[in-house]
Amino acid sequence: MKMKKMLFATAAAALALLGPASAQDFPTRPVTMVIPFAAGGPQDTIGRIISQRMSELLGQQVVVENVGGAGGMTGSKRVADAKPDGYTMVLGSVGTHAQNQTLYKHPLYNVLTDFTPVAYLAITPI
C-alpha cells in the first residue's frame, strides 16, 4: 500500500510538470514512450501507469513501446537517435543512464547530451 501511495505521489508530481507544456500546441500527434526493457517488469508497469495518465491529461495517445536488449541500450539508443521534438521519450533507469555508461567502453549514446530529463519517477530499493 505504501508503494502505491509513493508511486501515485511521484506520478502526480511528474504530471504537474506538464502544465507549462500545455500552453504550447503540444502534442498534436501520439507520443511514444520507449521502455528499454521487456514487458512485465517494474519499468514496464510504471511506464504503463504513467502513460495512461499522460494520455488523459494531454488529450493525445501515449504509446508504450518495449524495446529490450543490451541492458537497456537498444531502446535508449532508439530514443537518442529520434528527432528531439518531445514526441519520443525513454523511461530510463540507473542501468540505462549510469551503469551502462561506465560498464561499456563505447556506449551507444551519451546520457549528458542525448537526453533531456523530464521527471524523476521512482526509487528502487536495494
Where are these regions (language model features)?
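Bacterial N-terminal signal peptides
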Residues: 9-17
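Bacterial N-terminal signal peptides that target proteins for export
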Residues: 1-10
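Short Pro/Gly-enriched coil loops immediately N-terminal to beta-strands
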Residues: 113, 118-125
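Short beta-strands and strand-loop turn motifs
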Residues: 34, 125-126
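N-terminal (or domain-start) structured segment
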Residues: 23-116
